[in-house]
Amino acid sequence: HYPLRRQRQMCIRDSNKIERPAVPLPIRLSAIDPICLDILYNRGIKTPVEMEEFLFPSLTKQLRAHPPLLDMDKAVSILKAVVANKEMVTIYHDYDVDGVTAGVTALSALSQLGVPVNHYCNDRITGGFGINAAGVDEIVAKFPDTKVLLTVDNGIAGIEGVSRAKELGLKVIITDHHEPGAKLPDADAVIDHKRVDESARQDKNCCGAGVVWKLMLELYIGLGRNVEPVMDLLDIVALGTIADVVPLIGDNRAIVQEGLKRINSGARPFFQMCLEVLEKESIDAMTVAFRIAPMINAVSRMGGDASKLIDLFMETNADDLRAGIIALDDINEARKEETRRETELAKELVGKAPVGAIVFNHESLQEGIVGIVAGQLKEEFSLPAVVLAKDKDGNWKGSARSPEGFMLKEALDQCAEYLISYGGHAKAAGLTVRAADLDKFKEKLTKLALEAAGDKGFEVAIPIDAVLGAQDYTEDMVRHLGILEPFGEGFRQPLFGLIADNITGVRYMGTEEQHVRYQDESGLQVIQWNKGDEAKARKAPPKKFVGYPGLNVFRGNTTVQFIAE
C-alpha cells in the first residue's frame, strides 16, 4: 500500500557527484556562472561543444541534422498543386493548445500562398479526439468545395475517418505526432515521426504544431518562396510545443528559444494583449505553461468551441482581443474551481491508500477536465491514475496520467480487449472503457502497475541539482540561471537544496496566513506557498529547503527569494 502523500526526499543524483573537469572554455561559456555549467554537465551535456549547442541552438542546423520526414515529398507535391489551382483545403485540428496552434500554423501559411482555407474541430465531449467519419461528413456539408483534408495534431489513428474522406473523393494529408497503431490510415500522405519505418536519425519529439510547421517550411522551400512568413509562425509553434509537454531538446529547444523571442517582440497582437491582461512584463516558458496554455485548454474543457480560438489568435483589433483574452481567463478560473471540487471528490472516494493504479469513475465528473484531475491524482499518490466520466452511450470515457517508471501506452495495449478506443503516449493517454468491462480493466491495469512498481514503488525523490548555503544565492547567480531557459519537459527548472542554519524571522502572508516567509540572516527570503499551517505547527524553522531562487522587484528594489516546496 502507498500512503496518501509519500514524503519526497531531498537527494542528489549519483551523476551530480561528478565534478566537472577543468577544460578551456569558449568565450561565451567562460562568462557564465560555473553553477550553470555544472548543472548542464550533470544532466549529460558534458563537452563545451555540447553546452554551446544546447544553450545557443541553431534551428537551421537542427533541421539539417536529420532527413525529411517520410511522405513529406508526397504532401508537398499535393499542396503545390493546391497552390497552383487555388483548391480549397480544410484543416482538421484538435481542440487542445497543440491542435489549435497547429491549426493556426497551417491556416496562416496556406492563406499567405493564396489558398482558400477552412478549419474544423471536433467538439471535445460529443466528437472525441481525432478525425472521424461524422466529422468528415460535416466538413463536406459545410465546406463542399474542399479538395484536400489536412489533419494536424491528429489522424494517425483515424482509419475510419480517412476512409470516409477517400470515399468522398478527398485527398488526405495526415500530420501527427501520436503513436501509430499496427495499421496506418489509407491517406495520400502520412507524416508522423513516430512511424515505425521512420529514420532512426529523425527527431521524434516534435508536437503537432511542430510537425505541420515543418511541412509548411518544406512547401515554401519547394515553391521557391521566401520562408520568412513560416518563420514568423514560430511564436505560435513555441506555444504548442511548451503546452504539449514534449521534451525541450533538439528541434524543440531551438523552436521554443526562437519562438519566445518572437512572442516578446510585440509582433503578434495576441501575445501583446496577453502581456497586458496578465500584467506581465515578458513571457517565458513558465508563463506559457502555467498561464496562457491553461486558458486556451479551458475553452474545450468547459464545453466551448475550440475552433473559435483560431480566429482569436489572428485577431488584430485591440478591444476584441482584450475582451477575448479576459473571457479566456474567466473560463479558466471556472475550470480551476470545477477541477478543485472534482479532485477532492476523487480523493475522498479513492481513499488514503490506493494500490497499484488509481482508476476513478463517477457519473458527476465533467468529461472536459478528467485529464487535469488524473494529473493531480498522479501527483498526489505517485501512481498511474485514470479518471473516467460516463459518455452518452453509457461507457466510461476519460484520461490517464502516469509517473516515471510506468509506460502508459504499452499498458493500455495490454488492456485493449476492454477498451473501445484509446491512444496517447508513455505518460498521458485518452481512452474509452466498455461499461461491462470496467472492473476487468481496473483489475488488469492495477496488476500491470504493481508489476512495474516492484517493491520500491514509482520514483518520487526530488533530483536536486546542487545544495548551497543561503549566502550563495546572489542576484548575479539567479540572473545567470536564466541562460538555461527555456525550462520544461526534458529540461526541468533547476532544483536546489538550501541549507539555512540562521533563520532570524518568520512572517505569515495571505488573508488566512496560509503562506509563510522565512528571513535568513544573509538577507535571503524563503517563501513557502500554502504551508502556513505546517509552519505554525513546527517548534522551530526548518534548516533544509528544496526549491529554486528568483528575483523579487518591489518599489525599485531587487531582492533574492527562494521559492521552497
Each language-model region and where it sits:
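Beta-strand/loop nucleic-acid-binding surfaces
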Residues: 522-537
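A short acidic, amphipathic alpha-helical/loop segment
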Residues: 160-164, 358, 373-376, 476, ...
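Accessory interdomain/linker segments of ATP-dependent helicases and helicase-like nucleic-acid enzymes
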Residues: 466-524
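Active-site cavity-forming subdomains of large catalytic enzyme subunits
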Residues: 137-205, 209, 213-222
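A residue-level signal for conserved active-site and pocket-lining positions in enzyme catalytic cores
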Residues: 40, 150, 297, 481, ...
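OB-fold single-stranded nucleic acid-binding module
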Residues: 437-444, 512, 538-565
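Single conserved hydrophobic/aromatic residue that forms the stacking wall/gate
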Residues: 1-14
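Hydrophobic helix-and-loop "lid/oligomerization" segment in the mid-to-C-terminal part
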Residues: 21, 26-147, 167-168, 186, ...
